[in-house]
């Protein structure tokens, strides 16, 4: 196999694995088990917040955790395929130019959650799945966003507002060099560290994340309307 074929397979596997894993809607899975249709109850959104409304705090938290894990594990599977199979067909220079393409699985997982194959392309808002993806990409991104999301939620009691603020801030954070600590990789064998400020990698994440941010704001348009009218449900009103 030549390098071009290996790179093509990396892209295809990353996108397919990510999308198929992202398409698993755990709110619907638990709904089948508990005989409750989350799409007909509460806000009718198959996500973690509405799952708390419909199933209770414990199951809702479990739904959110599973949604986050699929974003993380999609990357892990892509990473394993790259590391144990496709990487051997690349020289050092080629490796340093394409290793980040494994993160396409994270992008595909969020798309799968929003447009799930198994549920007629009607999904959720991809907040938890994006969180799991951030954990796979950069610990700094993940920690900053988690702390920010928790602070806004605790202060305002609005989960939707916390999600929107976090996505907006992350859209800025990804432009900051050295914060994208790609800790799964060590592309520089001399420094043995994954901090980098390569413009094309930053551009790669921008081209993925900025359209996703626009999509998330669009998916929250009803929440934004309720926030402006002060009729949005607070976390104290979930149960």
Curated annotation (Swiss-Prot):
Q: How does it sit in the membrane?
A: Multi-pass membrane protein
**What parts of the sequence cross the membrane?**
6-26, 61-81, 99-119, 135-155, 159-179, 199-219
GO cellular component assignments: plasma membrane
Q: Which UniProt keywords are present, listed alphabetically?
A: Cell membrane, Lipid biosynthesis, Lipid metabolism, Membrane, Phospholipid biosynthesis, Phospholipid metabolism, Transferase, Transmembrane, Transmembrane helix
Its family remark reads: Belongs to the PlsY family.
Against InterPro entries, the record matches this protein to:
G3P_acylTferase_PlsY (IPR003811)
Location in the cell reads:
Cell membrane
The UniProt function text for this chain reads: Catalyzes the transfer of an acyl group from acyl-phosphate (acyl-PO(4)) to glycerol-3-phosphate (G3P) to form lysophosphatidic acid (LPA). This enzyme utilizes acyl-phosphate as fatty acyl donor, but not acyl-CoA or acyl-ACP.
Q: What is the lineage of its organism?
A: Bacteria, Bacillati, Mycoplasmatota, Mycoplasmoidales, Mycoplasmoidaceae
Do you know which NCBIfam families this protein is assigned to?
glycerol-3-phosphate 1-O-acyltransferase PlsY
User: Under which name does UniProt file this protein?
Assistant: Glycerol-3-phosphate acyltransferase
EC assignment: the record states: 2.3.1.275
The set of disulfide-linked cysteines is none
Biological process GO annotation list? phospholipid biosynthetic process
- Alphabetized Pfam families for the sequence: G3P_acyltransf
One function term, GO molecular function aspect: acyl-phosphate glycerol-3-phosphate acyltransferase activity
Q: Which reaction does it catalyse?
A: an acyl phosphate + sn-glycerol 3-phosphate = a 1-acyl-sn-glycero-3-phosphate + phosphate
**Gene that this polypeptide is encoded by:** plsY
**Quaternary structure annotation from Swiss-Prot or TrEMBL:** Probably interacts with PlsX.
The biological pathway it contributes to is: Lipid metabolism; phospholipid metabolism
